[in-house]
Amino acid sequence: MRNNFVPIILSFIIFLTPSIAEQEPSILSPVDQLLNKTSSYLDFSTKFNQPRIELTTSTIIAGLLSFLASSISSAGGIGGGGLYVPIMTIVAGLDLKTASSFSAFMVTGGSIANVGCNLFVRNPKSGGKTLIDFDLALLLEPCMLLGVSIGVICNLVFPNWLITSLFAVFLAWSTLKTFGNGLYYWRLESEMVKIRESNRIEEDDEEDKIESLKLPLLEDYQRPKRFPWIKLGVLVIIWLSYFAVYLLRGNKYGEGIISIEPCGNAYWLISSSQIPLTLFFTLWICFSDNVQSQQQSDYHVSVKDVEDLRSNDGARSNKCMFPVMALLAGVLGGVFGIGGGMLISPLLLQVGIAPEVTAATCSFMVLFSSTMSAIQYLLLGMEHTGTASIFAVICFVASLVGLKVVQKVITEYGRASIIVFSVGIVMALSIVLMTSYGALDVWNDYVSGRYMGFKLPC
């Protein structure tokens, strides 16, 4: 009886197993589908395995020019997208939209190197804090990220003639402001050099001893400054909030975490949710007393410090202007892949922020906006991602080289205005190259009879 009972139990288990197996997928199906959709949507390995651009002479020349452009642009922390786009279009022979997506990757690579270096550099004029002004970054970043989203859509909708015209107008204004600020800082530095020389002649041995006693006290006063991890965490939360919106929305093919119709009502509803998100973060930061910090040190009183104090007080009274400018900068960054630093940098210089702090803060903000722009290009079906990553590595190395050279020059000659002039030179070259190429592109469209009006984003 026992021998007959064992086969009956085994046959019952075998019969029951398929029914259990059929029930398990019904329980795990929603979770499995969500995980599969997320993994397939974020599976960039297939994009990186796309056929790369052939290694030709023009590609090598484009890489060398990109290295030179990144090393120059890294001094001002502006990203260099205004130079990358003409290089990739004129030299490498890419179309404007592909060049813009490449530029977003290249700006990201250079910004990573910039931020990595500036995080460990202390500003002696602000009590030993980092060169990056996290208060300004908090105030500007939400609107800049919203502008990037708008700019990417505008890149698909606007005709080439309108994009070229807007770029030329805004960049011309920024260039004039930058060179004006550069001349101002140059004259101010010249006056400070004369003051130091006159003081050096009048100093006697007793004053030298007093100064030698003061310096250790200053160093001890600056040491307790700690890294603002909370502010950095808030910036990361802001970035992740916008990234979550992009994951929910999906790309133009309707591929995302949730299944929605491409360019349907749900698509635009999720996209428009960035507006209240931006308003929430911006208003909270604007009216929060915690975002204000005293940047000046009581031990550094000079003509330049008085001017900076006066300018910073005016900037705080008109701080609502910063989000508007950040929005415009983000729009241009999304359209051209320039990171937005070319407009933010003249703004910060205009209100009296030191060139070193301006460059460091701009590179930090450009990192956030350029990574968001690069991710959006990926989600919109960007091609040749592997080649774009190679150019990003080139810009990363070039930025490290450029930063070291500029820091050595500033330390030796004491001319921080070199940073401002480098920004102006990059802007001027960008205007000439981008406007010339854009005008030729518009002329070719006109001669060939192509459609030169607005297009649908999808």
Swiss-Prot record:
It holds the Pfam family TauE. Signal peptide: none annotated. It is a multi-pass membrane protein. The keyword Transmembrane helix applies. The chain crosses the membrane at residues 5-25, 53-73, 74-94, 101-121, 128-148, 150-170, 227-247, 267-287, 324-344, 348-368, 386-406, 418-438. Its main location: membrane. It is found in: Membrane. Keywords: Membrane, Transmembrane, Transmembrane helix, Transport. PANTHER family: CEREBLON, SULFITE EXPORTER TAUE_SAFE FAMILY PROTEIN 1-RELATED. This is Sulfite exporter TauE/SafE family protein 2.
